[in-house]
UniProtKB/Swiss-Prot annotation:
HAMAP family reported in the protein's UniProt record: Lactate_dehydrog
Stated family: Belongs to the LDH/MDH superfamily. LDH family.
Protein name: L-lactate dehydrogenase A chain
Binding site for NAD(+): 29-57, 98, 137
This protein's encoding gene: ldha
Active-site residues (renumbered): 192
Assembly mode: Homotetramer.
Length: 331
């Protein structure tokens, strides 16, 4: 008799029970791992799968997390074979090529499209009913690519979009007002990154519109220069990259925030990237961030934001830029 047999007597043969809220993270780079640890520490799933083409790095990361199993309630698995991801509820895609110095955005996009041509069909094969969350950059274009390659309905393909931009925005407004970010309500919509659109007309604390108190807010003529806050949001990522080489923690927490709303069916409103054709005068098949309701079925509703003419124009301009890139892609 083995030690195990002496210690434990078997009462019944266990039937394998599938995980009801399994999450997969594709890509174990800085963003993938920050997303994984954030999901684990929020206790969102009973199984977390990780997959990557870099076998040793993947093995090391999985092992490192498994060594902390005592402090977690989640089963952690990892493999370069996508069968490990089977029956996931949410699949978070963080994998992709990094932009090389002097490389055009379009070239980077096409390289990532080629990577997605391998990743997305594999996800669909093993988790045909999952909700796909794209985090890789440029996120709006790659969410469109994932939607096209997966054949999923639009409610099940979401881009992390401006959820992080809005969090940065609220943090900086909070710093200026000496308030917690959760008490500063503010939205950034549109394209994630350089051409994102801050909705100054909607910025409020306890329902008090800040633009009502300072009608010049967000414009060039504002003596308090609130506009600089949006510039800081846009420059924030570049600043972090300059200082530490990459961004990870905030985007990881942002991803876990979105996963939580889906897994727990919270019907929370988040600025995430979705198909905006027909909204705000956008004519093309593009994905941009608008306030959207997230729950168990993915993205169930979109909130109609009251945007000023200038803000709508910025959105349409982003849409045209994205479409210009998308129509050149070979899918």
């Amino acid at each position: 008799m083995s030690t195990k047999e002496k210690l434990i007597s078997h009462v019944m043969k266990e039937e394998p029970v599938g995980s009801r809220n399994k999450v997969t993270v594709v890509g174990v780079g800085m963003v993938g791992m920050a997303s994984a640890i954030s999901i684990l520490l929020k206790d969102l799933c009973d199984e977390l799968a990780m997959v990557d083409v870099m076998e040793d790095k993947l093995k090391g990361e999985v092992m490192d997390l498994q060594h902390g199993s005592l402090f977690l309630k989640t089963k952690i698995v990892g493999d370069k074979d996508y069968s490990v991801t089977a029956n996931s509820k949410v699949v978070v895609v963080t994998a992709g090529a990094r932009q090389q110095e002097g490389e055009s955005r379009l070239n980077l996009v096409q390289r990532n499209v080629n990577i997605f041509k391998f990743i997305i069909p594999n996800i669909v094969k093993y988790s045909p009913n999952c909700i796909l969350m794209v985090v890789s950059n440029p996120v709006d274009i790659l969410t469109y690519v994932a939607w096209k390659l997966s054949g999923f309905p639009r409610n099940r393909v979401i881009g992390s979009g401006t959820n992080l931009d809005s969090a940065r925005f609220r943090h900086l407004i909070g710093e200026k007002l000496h308030l917690h970010p959760s008490s500063c309500h503010a939205w950034i919509v549109g394209e994630h990154g350089d051409s994102s659109v801050p909705v100054w007309s909607g910025v409020n604390v306890a329902g008090v519109s800040l633009q009502g108190l300072n009608p010049q807010m967000g414009t060039e003529g504002d003596g308090e220069n609130w506009k600089a806050i949006h510039k800081e949001v846009v420059d924030g990522a570049y600043e972090v990259i300059k200082l530490k080489g990459y961004t990870s923690w905030a985007i990881g927490m942002s991803v876990a925030d979105l996963v939580e709303s889906i897994i727990k069916n919270m019907h929370k409103v988040h600025p995430v990237s979705t198909l905006v054709q027909g909204m705000h005068g956008v004519k093309d098949e593009v994905f941009l961030s608008v306030p959207s309701v997230l729950g168990n079925s993915g993205l169930t509703d979109v909130i109609h934001m009251t945007l000023k003419a200038e803000e709508e124009k910025q959105l349409q301009k982003s849409a045209e830029t994205l479409w210009g890139v998308q129509k050149e892609l070979t899918l």
